[in-house]
């Protein structure tokens, strides 16, 4: 007999968000070896500025050689480490986070808890702030992985704060109160609000007015405020990034023990494989408990050593942040212009590694069933893995998250060519031969049958 965790289906793996990934992994596009494969546009990964980091590593071979002042530090890094983390690394992280926020916020390393990525950080916070069956309110659309990260092992429930396209998905007082009341009607004990700023999947930064509203709301309700700020260094256009800590400081709530921030180097530096994340909190009990829990997901000492040196180079970090934002802006503009040529529009965005794309005009009907059918066609026939809005708990059918920073310029052009061919074909034009060939139709049909078993209701 296995545990309920093993035999249950609460992980969320049957979401279209994960199903699209599975199909991509079976048949990934390659510019030379598999030009008819699926292009991965469902992965929020930043590969646009790797060359800057690689150049720095070439110029600092002693870091990869695990040396300091020409002496080996291998032994001290290889032995057991205090799970509070290397002081040099925490100092460097504090300065880097401050630089992103233009030093309007200062970070105290004693209030930091290092974790193996933001997934671990968010889950650890749920363990610290809520009991099984308690609820957190999250603005929707939201990152599909939260259904796994926040709920699966903790037993915490998520109640969506319904935001709408008509006002650019702004968080409103009415939407907050509605979510809170819905939670109470379901006998859920609301423990806090969690936001992603900038938003995943919208690619927009939360405004100062929204943050002020959120802090007033959580303070009035006496609940926690969690701000996941892993995309804070990707804001490439106005309005500039504003941290919840900055607004809290202005509201004389700077030392509030119910305000917590999550950060990671996965998006800003494009290092998800390094598994570097952290929790920042003024709450001593949260910091203490989270530090103990971090022993289940530590950052390797070698990784901390490398990044402490990298992030301590002020000239490098300044240049990297500026150049990375420039490249993100250019790539986003290329995606938006390519989609526009095909008659497709996007939500106006200023941050992140993705766009929130409006395909409502391509739906056969204004339903999530129609969205699911369109998504299946885009993955199967067009060969693009994108994330449907229903997987992000969007209330309106026809919106999709499309990632743009995890591929080369050449692959982006292939994707845009496929989109245009698909739209032309839908409009009665002739579909281009960049789509799937006849040889693979039988495989597609088998997969369509599998996808059809996933109902829209289960994804919402």
Curated annotation (Swiss-Prot):
Q: Which Pfam families match?
A: Aminotran_1_2
What is the reaction catalyzed?
S-adenosyl-L-methionine = 1-aminocyclopropane-1-carboxylate + S-methyl-5'-thioadenosine + H(+)
Record's keyword annotation contains Lyase: yes
- Tissues expressed in: Expressed in roots.
Q: Name one GO molecular function term.
A: pyridoxal phosphate binding
Residue list for modification N6-(pyridoxal phosphate)lysine:
267
Q: What class of enzyme is it?
A: lyase
Question: How does acidity or alkalinity (pH) affect activity?
Answer: Optimum pH is 8.
For activity, the cofactor(s) needed are: pyridoxal 5'-phosphate
Q: Which GO terms describe its biological process?
A: ethylene biosynthetic process; fruit ripening
Pathway noted in the entry: Alkene biosynthesis; ethylene biosynthesis via S-adenosyl-L-methionine; ethylene from S-adenosyl-L-methionine: step 1/2
Which branch of life, at top level?
Eukaryota
Positions with a binding annotation for substrate:
45, 83
Give EC number(s), comma-separated.
4.4.1.14
InterPro entries named among the record's database cross-references? Aminotransferase_I/II_large (IPR004839), Ethylene_sulfur-biosynth (IPR050478), NHTrfase_class1_PyrdxlP-BS (IPR004838), PyrdxlP-dep_Trfase (IPR015424), PyrdxlP-dep_Trfase_major (IPR015421), PyrdxlP-dep_Trfase_small (IPR015422)
Coiled-coil-forming residues are none
Report the PTM annotation. May be processed at its C-terminus.
Question: What conditions trigger expression of this protein?
Answer: By indole-3-acetic acid (IAA) and cycloheximide (CHX).
Its quaternary organisation is:
Homodimer and heterodimer. In vivo, the relevance of heterodimerization with other ACS enzymes is however unsure. Interacts with GRF3.
| Recorded family membership | Belongs to the class-I pyridoxal-phosphate-dependent aminotransferase family.
**What extra comment accompanies this record?**
The stability of ACS proteins, and the regulation of such stability, play a central role in ethylene biosynthesis.
Q: What does this protein do?
A: 1-aminocyclopropane-1-carboxylate synthase (ACS) enzymes catalyze the conversion of S-adenosyl-L-methionine (SAM) into 1-aminocyclopropane-1-carboxylate (ACC), a direct precursor of ethylene.
This chain belongs to which protein, by name?
1-aminocyclopropane-1-carboxylate synthase 11
According to its UniProt entry, this protein's organism is Arabidopsis thaliana
Taxonomy of origin reads:
Eukaryota, Viridiplantae, Streptophyta, Embryophyta, Tracheophyta
